[in-house]
Each structure stands twice: as C-alpha cells, then as structure tokens.
Amino acid sequence: MHLKRAYPKDCLSGVGSNACRIGDRQSRYPVTIECESTGTSGGGVYEIVKTGDPVLRLTAKPLNSDEIQSEAIQQLIAAMAERMREAPGVGLAAPQVGVSVQLVVIEDRPEYIERLSGAERREREREPVPFHVLINPVLSVEGEESAVFFEGCLSIPGYQGLVARARVVRVEALDERAAPVVIRAHGWYARILQHEIDHLNGLLCVDRMDLQTFSTLENYDRFWRGG
C-alpha cells in the first residue's frame, strides 16, 4: 500500500468557475492511497499543510484492517508523531500532512501543561494524555455541558480564537493494530478529540470560532490572556 495526494489539475490552478467549490469536495479533490507517498520518516518528510490547501476540506476516507497494518500507514503514523512533537502540538490529523484518511495522533505531554498556571490547568481541566492513535473515530457528545476557550491549529499557525466545545465526549475507534478502543474524555482532552476529528470531516477550528476573537498570538497575549 502506498500513499499520495492527487488533485485535478484545474483545482490546483484555479481554472474554471467551479474548480474549487467546497460542495464538490469529494469528486473535485480525490485523494488516493495507491501510489508513492510524498515522504515518510523512513525516506521523505510529511510536512504540515496550511489553511487554504484543499486537502483540509475533504471528508477523509476510512481505513480497513489490512490498510491499518500496512507498512505505509505505520510509517505515516510514525511521521505524524514526529511532526506533532516538532511543532509542538497536542494532536495531528492525517489531512494535516496531506493524506486524506481517517487517522489522528494525540499526545498532551506533561511539559506542555507545566507552562500553565495552576488556575489555568484547573479551569481547562487539563491533564497529561499519553501518545495514542485513533483510526476511523466516531465521536458522540455526552451531556449538555460546554466550555469556551481559545484554540489554535497547526494548520493555521500564529492565530487563536474562542471556540465552544462539548465538555464530555465518547469516541469509538480503532488503534494502530486495528483493535477497537473506546474513550470517554472530558475537559481539554475532549477538546483535542473534537478538534482532531473535525479535521477528518473537512472542518477547521475557525469554522466553529467566534471570529470577533480571532487573534494573532501576540495580540492574544496582549489583550485576551488572563482576561
């Protein structure tokens, strides 16, 4: 199994009145898993793509058990973990490295949380989350509680804004061995899950954001942090 991105020429060039219409995302922006990859940690390098790249607006394809256990997907997982930690970030979805498949990696390391004050940790309900992989995740909201916090994205670097998310969620998925997993999460971990699974459905955090709060990181620190 090999991985690649594949877009029609007219979409990449912007030719044609409907070349990049989001409503046609499935047919206009096909992504296959049949040819050579743009790179893996064993060879080339998967780079984090930025907002405006059509791959971020696709509905990602599910993976079957054989695909999950293939060398290509295992290499993709390793490369995604590397990119996430280099950024650094607490989660990364496959579309963010240009591969439209239903796969995310998540890790909220203790050293990230140590940068926050005790009050911030408690308010955000943020605890360390060990590295794990979720494939073909299905998320459901539990209860009616929500929380609103500033949120950023590795594909929209340098910006944050307020996003309302469910406080408690349940996720059913497969792990990197194609074994079923069930997660019930609350607080910041629930937010990470919602953010990353949104990516698999062609959604970015700005689609759920209060755009009046959309800020550069500099202005977030200047006007919003702790306010």
UniProtKB/Swiss-Prot annotation:
Pfam families: Pep_deformylase (PF01327). Fe cation binds at residues 153, 195, 199. It catalyses: N-terminal N-formyl-L-methionyl-[peptide] + H2O = N-terminal L-methionyl-[peptide] + formate. It is an enzyme of class 3 (hydrolase). Its cofactor is Fe(2+). It comes from the Bacteria. GO terms for molecular function: metal ion binding; peptide deformylase activity. Keywords: Hydrolase, Iron, Metal-binding, Protein biosynthesis. Binds 1 Fe(2+) ion. The active site is at 196. InterPro entries: Peptide_deformylase, Peptide_deformylase_sf. Removes the formyl group from the N-terminal Met of newly synthesized proteins. Requires at least a dipeptide for an efficient rate of reaction. N-terminal L-methionine is a prerequisite for activity but the enzyme has broad specificity at other positions. This is Peptide deformylase 1. It comes from Gloeobacter violaceus (strain ATCC 29082 / PCC 7421). The lineage of its organism: Bacteria, Bacillati, Cyanobacteriota, Cyanophyceae, Gloeobacterales.
